[in-house]
Amino acid sequence: LALLFLVLSAGSGFTQGVRNFVTCRINRGFCVPIRCPGHRRQIGTCLAPQIKCCR
């Protein structure tokens, strides 16, 4: 699991933000096709720009 995390984190570029479903979940986020609900904030996207990763 740690090796998987290292591979995904190195490939995704955490300094550039979350850009896919896997890194969204690793960062304790969830994907939604609308604005982030309630007090949640957008931390990236999930494959398509219109699908937001919220945390």
Swiss-Prot record:
<keyword id="KW-0211">Defensin</keyword>
<dbReference type="GO" id="GO:0031731">
    <property type="term" value="F:CCR6 chemokine receptor binding"/>
</dbReference>
<dbReference type="GO" id="GO:0042056">
    <property type="term" value="F:chemoattractant activity"/>
</dbReference>
<dbReference type="GO" id="GO:0005615">
    <property type="term" value="C:extracellular space"/>
</dbReference>
<feature type="disulfide bond">
    <location>
        <begin position="36"/>
        <end position="54"/>
    </location>
</feature>
<feature type="disulfide bond">
    <location>
        <begin position="31"/>
        <end position="46"/>
    </location>
</feature>
<dbReference type="GO" id="GO:0060326">
    <property type="term" value="P:cell chemotaxis"/>
</dbReference>
<keyword id="KW-0873">Pyrrolidone carboxylic acid</keyword>
<keyword id="KW-1015">Disulfide bond</keyword>
<keyword id="KW-0044">Antibiotic</keyword>
<protein>
    <recommendedName>
        <fullName>Beta-defensin 9</fullName>
    </recommendedName>
</protein>
<keyword id="KW-0964">Secreted</keyword>
<feature type="modified residue" description="Pyrrolidone carboxylic acid">
    <location>
        <position position="16"/>
    </location>
</feature>
<feature type="disulfide bond">
    <location>
        <begin position="24"/>
        <end position="53"/>
    </location>
</feature>
<keyword id="KW-0929">Antimicrobial</keyword>
<keyword id="KW-0732">Signal</keyword>
<comment type="function">
    <text>Has bactericidal activity. Active against E.coli ML35 and S.aureus 502A.</text>
</comment>
<comment type="similarity">
    <text>Belongs to the beta-defensin family.</text>
</comment>
<dbReference type="GO" id="GO:0042742">
    <property type="term" value="P:defense response to bacterium"/>
</dbReference>
<dbReference type="InterPro" id="IPR006080">
    <property type="entry name" value="Beta/alpha-defensin_C"/>
</dbReference>
<dbReference type="InterPro" id="IPR001855">
    <property type="entry name" value="Defensin_beta-like"/>
</dbReference>
<dbReference type="Pfam" id="PF00711">
    <property type="entry name" value="Defensin_beta"/>
</dbReference>
